[in-house]
Amino acid sequence: MKHDESKNTFKHNNIRIAVVQVGLYFEKGGNTTDFFNDLIKFIDKNPDVDSIVFSENNVFSFKTPYNKELAEKLLQDIKNSNLQQKISFFLSFNGYKEFNNVVTLYIFKNNTHLNQKKALIPFIEKRGLFNRESNINSVYYQIYDSHVNKSFRVKDSSVSTFICYDALFPEVTKKNSEVILIQSNYRLLDKGFGHDKLKYLATYLARFLNGMQSKVIINIQNYGGTVVLYDNWRINNDIYEKSKNEPFIIVDLDIK
């Protein structure tokens, strides 16, 4: 992905991120049989990827037998490919094993960690106005108060993750990360006209609330329209337009 160097200070190939817009892949005719093979082909065509980041999605989940099978197959495919030895993964699951919340699953080498969604929509994502216990087979999720979300390192840069609307609520304990990844699914809010502006405004607000010290925010959208916002408040429109039609895209960053 080429950028106009006269307009920003970002160079190429410091951190290379492969963005996977899961919903758009299937909307464009992709299928569960070919999904991982298509991703591998994309990585082969775009060498030196440091991280692969999935959108929030409704495909990979442990809440139904069918989706659990897809989730377990994805994890096994990653393990068999051995990609996690050189590429860090930021996956997205609706529930993970018995952990009944929307999560980011970080995998790199022998390290794994779950970051959970901290802002659940009442009566839709959680049972009522307050946080209540729900098992993995429930249609609802729960927040685990004792679970600690953490930040990560990609090469020499710090990376924080948020899940969709989480990024619109200021964290009590700030993690000043250089890169913020937001795994989103705004499909329910897509009413046509104004949807592009909504994604822009949400990303600006996320930067204001949680990323004022960050170099870049990447708001990964499930059905396309991923927003890359730099520290000078400039959005990369080339990436945004490309991401509307291509499920897999590359974002090259220099965090120096």
Residue ranges of each PLM-predicted region?
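Active-site regions of metal-assisted phosphoester/phosphodiester hydrolases
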Residues: 9-13, 124-128, 152, 179, ...
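Residues that flank catalytic or metal-binding motifs in active/ligand-binding sites
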Residues: 13, 101, 148, 222-224
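A structural signal for well-ordered alpha-helical scaffolds and beta->alpha junctions
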Residues: 36, 145, 199-203
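Soluble catalytic regions of membrane-associated enzymes that act on cell-envelope
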Residues: 3-121
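Active-site catalytic loop in hydrolytic enzyme cores
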Residues: 100-170, 174, 244, 255
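CN hydrolase (nitrilase-like) catalytic-core segments centered on the catalytic cysteine
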Residues: 66-90, 97, 158-159, 163-249, ...
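Short, conserved catalytic or adaptor-binding loops enriched in Gly and charged residues
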Residues: 8-11, 81, 151-153, 208-211
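Residue-level marker of positions within ordered structural domains that often coincide
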Residues: 9, 22, 157, 185-186
